[in-house]
Amino acid sequence: MSRVAKKPVSLPKGVELKVQPELVSVKGPKGTLTLPKPAGVEIAIDGDVATLSANDPSQIALTGTVRAILANMVKGVSEGFERKLELVGVGYRAAMQGKDLSLALGFSHPLVFVAPEGITLSTPTQTEIVVQGADKQRVGEVAAKIRGFRPPEPYKGKGVKYADEVIIRKEAKKA
């Protein structure tokens, strides 16, 4: 069996894991997440620990993947995930308008981004955006969508970048 699949998933206090024939749901203080249960992967719950096993040798790799997704779901409903973005450039600003995010990124018009359900956006400063939510995949997807409006360019580094991202700079053309 894969090394990832052998490791059990621990369930913190307040997190409830339900396994149905076609669906796996994780409920916690930050919400509820569901996952379609793949055929050939068995999930056994023993107290506050969930273990996964494969019914078929061809499903061993899938078992490791499902275990990683399940661990992220448990972490998401208990702690949540967040991704920070920074706006670099003169006149680049972000502001909240109710639940919508308004971005001034050098275009002739402000961009308005509507947060999907289950995702909260906040702007601690005019040049910072924080994306939070229980689903790791959706948090990353929303952050990537916002970054995609104006990705950082390599000459001056202007654009929307992840807080922990390092932009590799290029030297300007010599005359």
Swiss-Prot record:
Superkingdom per UniProt: Bacteria
Alphabetical GO biological process terms: cytoplasmic translation
Keyword RNA-binding included in the entry's annotation: yes
PROSITE patterns per the UniProt record, alphabetical: RIBOSOMAL_L6_1
Coiled-coil ranges from the UniProt annotation: none
Keywords: Ribonucleoprotein, Ribosomal protein, RNA-binding, rRNA-binding
Molecular function as annotated in GO: rRNA binding; structural constituent of ribosome
Keyword Transcription regulation: no
A GO term from the CC aspect: cytosolic large ribosomal subunit
InterPro entries from the UniProt entry: Ribosomal_uL6-like, Ribosomal_uL6-like_a/b-dom_sf, Ribosomal_uL6_a/b-dom, Ribosomal_uL6_bac-type, Ribosomal_uL6_CS
Family: Belongs to the universal ribosomal protein uL6 family.
Description of how the protein assembles with itself and partners: Part of the 50S ribosomal subunit.
HAMAP family named among the record's database cross-references: Ribosomal_uL6_B
Function: This protein binds to the 23S rRNA, and is important in its secondary structure. It is located near the subunit interface in the base of the L7/L12 stalk, and near the tRNA binding site of the peptidyltransferase center.
Protein's name according to its UniProt entry: Large ribosomal subunit protein uL6
Taxonomy of the source species: Bacteria, Pseudomonadati, Pseudomonadota, Gammaproteobacteria, Lysobacterales
